[in-house]
């Protein structure tokens, strides 16, 4: 009885280890895989690319001033809520 229980638990452990293995892709680079599939897999693959943010700032230089103006309106202007007026005075 004890031998059968040990054998059963070893078999169960082996199945759990095999099923629980993460799926390994042949190509570990997500960028390469996304280019080959011609579809973005996950944005984590492209997070290290700062060219997109540089492009946005260069294409519209008023973007930063517009963001700053919007933030001031949210804090002190017509979009200010009761909580922001309490917080910022």
UniProtKB/Swiss-Prot annotation:
Keywords for this protein: Amidation, Cleavage on pair of basic residues, Neuropeptide, Secreted, Signal
Tissues where this protein is expressed: Each flp gene is expressed in a distinct set of neurons. Flp-19 is expressed in the URX interneurons, the serotonin and acetylcholine-expressing HSN neurons, and the AIN, AWA and BAG neurons.
S-S bonds: none
Signal peptide limits: 1-20
GO BP: any one term: neuropeptide signaling pathway
Positions of the pro-segment in this chain: 21-67, 80-89
Residues where Phenylalanine amide is found: 76
tRNA processing as UniProt keyword: no
A Gene Ontology term for the protein's cellular component: extracellular region
Compartments where found: Secreted
Function: FMRFamides and FMRFamide-like peptides are neuropeptides. WANQVRF-amide inhibits the activity of dissected pharyngeal myogenic muscle system.
Family indicated by similarity: Belongs to the FARP (FMRFamide related peptide) family.
Protein name, UniProt field: FMRFamide-like neuropeptides 19
The gene coding this protein: flp-19
């Amino acid at each position: 009885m004890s031998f059968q229980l040990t054998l059963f638990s070893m078999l169960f452990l082996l199945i759990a280890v095999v099923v629980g293995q993460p799926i390994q892709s042949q190509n570990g680079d997500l960028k390469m895989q996304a280019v080959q599939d011609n579809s973005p897999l996950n944005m984590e693959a492209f997070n290290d690319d700062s060219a997109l943010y540089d492009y946005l700032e260069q294409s519209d230089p008023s973007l930063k001033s517009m963001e700053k103006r919007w933030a001031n309106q949210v804090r002190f202007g017509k979009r200010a809520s009761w909580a922001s007026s309490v917080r910022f005075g």
